[in-house]
Curated annotation (Swiss-Prot):
Assembly information from the UniProt record: Homodimer; disulfide-linked. Heterohexamer composed of two subunits of KLRK1 and four subunits of HCST/DAP10. Isoform 1 (via transmembrane domain) interacts with HCST/DAP10; the interaction is required for KLRK1 cell surface expression on activated CD8(+) T-cells, but is dispensable on activated TYROBP-expressing NK cells. Isoform 2 (via transmembrane domain) interacts with HCST/DAP10 (via transmembrane domain); the interaction is required for KLRK1 NK cell surface expression and induces NK cell-mediated cytotoxicity.
Record organism: Mus musculus
Subcellular location: Cell membrane
InterPro entries assigned to the protein according to its UniProt record, in alphabetical order: C-type_lectin-like (IPR001304), C-type_lectin-like/link_sf (IPR016186), CTDL_fold (IPR016187), NKG2D (IPR042169), NKR-like_CTLD (IPR033992)
GO cellular component: cell surface; external side of plasma membrane; plasma membrane
Extracellular face of the membrane: 90-232
Note: Is not capable of signal transduction by itself; isoform 1 operates either through the signaling adapter protein HCST and isoform 2 through both HCST and TYROBP signaling adapter proteins. Some families of ligands for mouse and human KLRK1 receptors have been characterized being very similar in structure and highly likely to be orthologs. In humans, an additional distinct subfamily of ligands (MICA and MICB) differs structurally, having an extra MHC alpha 3-like domain.
TM stretches of this protein: 67-89
Knockout-associated phenotype: Mice display no visible phenotype. According to PubMed:18394936, show normal development of NK cells, B and T cells but display enhanced formation of aggressive tumors. According to PubMed:19631564, exhibit developmental perturbation in size of NK cell subpopulations, increased proliferation, faster maturation and increased sensitivity to apoptosis of immature NK cells, and lower cytolytic response to KLRK1-sensitive tumor targets.
Protein name, entry field: NKG2-D type II integral membrane protein
Cytoplasmic side: 1-66
Annotated function: Functions as an activating and costimulatory receptor involved in immunosurveillance upon binding to various cellular stress-inducible ligands displayed at the surface of autologous tumor cells and virus-infected cells. Provides both stimulatory and costimulatory innate immune responses on activated killer (NK) cells, leading to cytotoxic activity. Acts as a costimulatory receptor for T-cell receptor (TCR) in CD8(+) T-cell-mediated adaptive immune responses by amplifying T-cell activation. Stimulates perforin-mediated elimination of ligand-expressing tumor cells.
Amino acid sequence: MALIRDRKSHHSEMSKCHNYDLKPAKWDTSQEQQKQRLALTTSQPGENGIIRGRYPIEKLKISPMFVVRVLAIALAIRFTLNTLMWLAIFKETFQPVLCNKEVPVSSREGYCGPCPNNWICHRNNCYQFFNEEKTWNQSQASCLSQNSSLLKIYSKEEQDFLKLVKSYHWMGLVQIPANGSWQWEDGSSLSYNQLTLVEIPKGSCAVYGSSFKAYTEDCANLNTYICMKRAV
């Protein structure tokens, strides 16, 4: 009987236990997650600039187009600076003064002008560079229509700015068929201390190149030309 009572008592105790609402304990993980995130944001970058942790941060990627644009801007700035530098050198060397005003005779040493509008005045001579291409005869006629003649070299010292000319232009120098000598438009003979003449076959007219060098050429060829006249 005692054994039966003990079993009933044990069964009663077990029933009471089953009647309890036994649920698994819940842990408040919000604070733990905040600590982990804070640790990630304050961690020092490791190798390759990556922060190691539960939430890895990707590497910073630079677009190729961004690099191309930066290089293009840098080249544009460099080109602009070079252009400004050469313009300053050109201005200082050529001194392209457009002479439209009379100056006192007493300042004859620095006198220049007057010249027609848009002509270059240098050492009391007026020059105009024409970009249209013509034959030698057409170029001569164009200069005559403007009361001028094709370029003549008479002094390296006074025409020093012409040494910077790079392209080829008709000048007022032609070969006389009778004796093969070279003369200027005004009939004066070429002096070889004025410029160096490089002769080629079948060339009876001359173009001015640079550094006081002239090259013979067929008069029927098309070239740009330079007109010149004395300033009044």
